[in-house]
Amino acid sequence: MASSQVGDMVNGNAEPTRHLAKFPPSLWGDRFTSFTLDKQLWDKYGNEIEVLKEQVRSMVVAGGRKAAEQINLINVLERLGVSYHFEKEIEEQLEQLFAKFEDNEDYDLFTIALHFRIFRQHGYKMSCDVFNKFRDSNCEFKETVSNDVQGMLSLYEATYLKIRGEGFLDEAHAFTIAQLESLVEGPHLSSDLSEQVMHALKQSIHRGFPRLEAKHFISFYEKDASRNETLLRLAKLDFNQLQLSHREELCHIFRWWKELDLISKVPYARDRAVECFFWSTCAYYEPQHSVGRAGLTKIMLLLSVTDDTYDAYGTYNELKLYTNAVQRWDVSAMDELPDYMKALYRALLNVYDEVERDLAKQGRAYGVHHSKEAFKEIVRSYEIEAEWFKEGYVASFEEYMKNALVTSTGRLHTTSCFMGLEADVATTEAFEWILTKPKMVAASGAIGRLVDDVMSHDEEQERGHVATGLDCYMKQHGVSKQEAIVELYKMIENAWRDINEEMLKPTAISMKLLIRVLNLSRISDVVYKYVDGYTHPEIINDHVISLFEDPIPM
């Protein structure tokens, strides 16, 4: 993210010229400042959930079920958002199913594509050759499957698990989109199935926000004549109970942010406490990660204000002072800063102290150092962009991306997210892995950086902004804006391929860690799908309300 400040104080007297971004204000007022958890309702949900979990666990491990039926059960559990209760059992089942899988089984397209997606989601490298039997001698899809809406939908979702070099899945992706759009426009689909297809075309399973997609699927599954009432009941109860937890956490975060009162001292910045918590909930929604969600949200809030300071307020000389202060990470450095920066710097140091104290209670404070170092690195890269803007410099695309992969926050968000995980998962080796600049973290950062560059380009250039990836690519290659956008989206797709490949076994680190990097990539797809939904929070307003306020009717 970049710098839009111009001018500096003359002899320390005149107020410098500042190109303010005039960001939209917070949407929420005092909406989330008070919430009282209904303990009786919580206990009621919890007691029934425990009973249902044991019933479902028995279903998962029960023998005698055909492989296709077992894969379908696992798929339903995952899409209903309750599979996290049965991770061990599901992994054991999938290991057996993958070892025994025979692609000469008389499976239809829906079933083959479902196997492919589920196996790949769990790290098993199933070959896309399994789809060859659905193509004719011209390598085109047979007419018998082209009009199979469930088969097309299943294959469409499976194509999002592609890796580099799988041209067939690229072709299948384009083909299934065209077929599904045609089928939706026709007269033969039921309204329920049509709604399901339209939602899938807008948001794929693999790139979606897990809890939001679970809520959507619950509404579809409820209308399915073959639904299992036990699974449906568990999903509804689990969503509503977890929503109560998240709402209580959001209330604590929101009150903390109001009491911190930082925005009154830096009114140029985006006020996004709710949106940062929304982001953190995508990274990890499970109940045991409440401390992690709080810490990640607080760090994201301070980074957001820091970004806006470099991007839309601070002068170059002020920013150099702030960069130096952050590198020192010492309260005495505050003396050299302008008043508004003192408030931000004090908040930064205090937030990290708070997070470190909270994690120390659980013996997990060792990751805080890595998060601090990542924060320092981002600030150094923000200053580079500020200098580029001051000089009117347009970097080569390669030079831009080298710096942008830092400002994309991939390392900081991943490190800060890992801090909130269990000590036996987020080990010291996990933090050292991040320092190696792994392909998956770089890919996640590239997705966030490039999609943001595309979606925020016009608005940022209007107010004055360092050249973004879009500008750098246009200048270097002599192409139009639209041509550059096409190329940037190709890069985004390749980044997704890299993420998918890094999650195939054997993995560099635990899948429990890699899924967090995937989730941080997913939020970029959701928030920046059509516009910059972080800067313009009304775009994701419905998502926030659905996730934190509206329970599922029982």
UniProtKB/Swiss-Prot annotation:
Catalytic activity: (2E,6E)-farnesyl diphosphate + H2O = valerianol + diphosphate
Pfam families (alphabetical): Terpene_synth, Terpene_synth_C
Domain notes: The Asp-Asp-Xaa-Xaa-Asp/Glu (DDXXD/E) motif is important for the catalytic activity, presumably through binding to Mg(2+).
Keywords, alphabetical: Lyase, Magnesium, Metal-binding
Motif range (DDXXD motif): 326-330
Binding site for Mg(2+) 3: D452, S456, E460
GO biological process: diterpenoid biosynthetic process; sesquiterpenoid biosynthetic process
Protein source organism: Camellia hiemalis
Broad enzyme group: lyase
PANTHER family: ALPHA-HUMULENE_(-)-(E)-BETA-CARYOPHYLLENE SYNTHASE, OS04G0344100 PROTEIN-RELATED
Cofactor binding, per record: Binds 3 Mg(2+) ions per subunit.
Cofactor(s) the protein needs: Mg(2+)
Alphabetized GO MF terms: carbon-oxygen lyase activity, acting on phosphates; magnesium ion binding; terpene synthase activity
Pathway: Secondary metabolite biosynthesis; terpenoid biosynthesis
InterPro entries xref list: Isoprenoid_synthase_dom_sf, Terpene_cyclase-like_1_C, Terpene_cyclase_plant_C1, Terpene_synth_N, Terpene_synth_N_sf, Terpene_synthase-like, Terpene_synthase_metal-bd, Terpenoid_cyclase/PrenylTrfase
Residue positions binding Mg(2+) 2: D307, D311
Lineage: Eukaryota, Viridiplantae, Streptophyta, Embryophyta, Tracheophyta
This protein's record includes keyword Lyase: yes
Name of protein: Valerianol synthase TPS1F
Enzyme Commission number: 4.2.3.204
SUPFAM superfamilies: Terpenoid cyclases/Protein prenyltransferases, Terpenoid synthases
Family: Belongs to the terpene synthase family.
Function: Terpene synthase that catalyzes the biosynthesis of the terpene valerianol, which is a volatile compound of floral scent.
Residues where Mg(2+) 1 binds: D307, D311
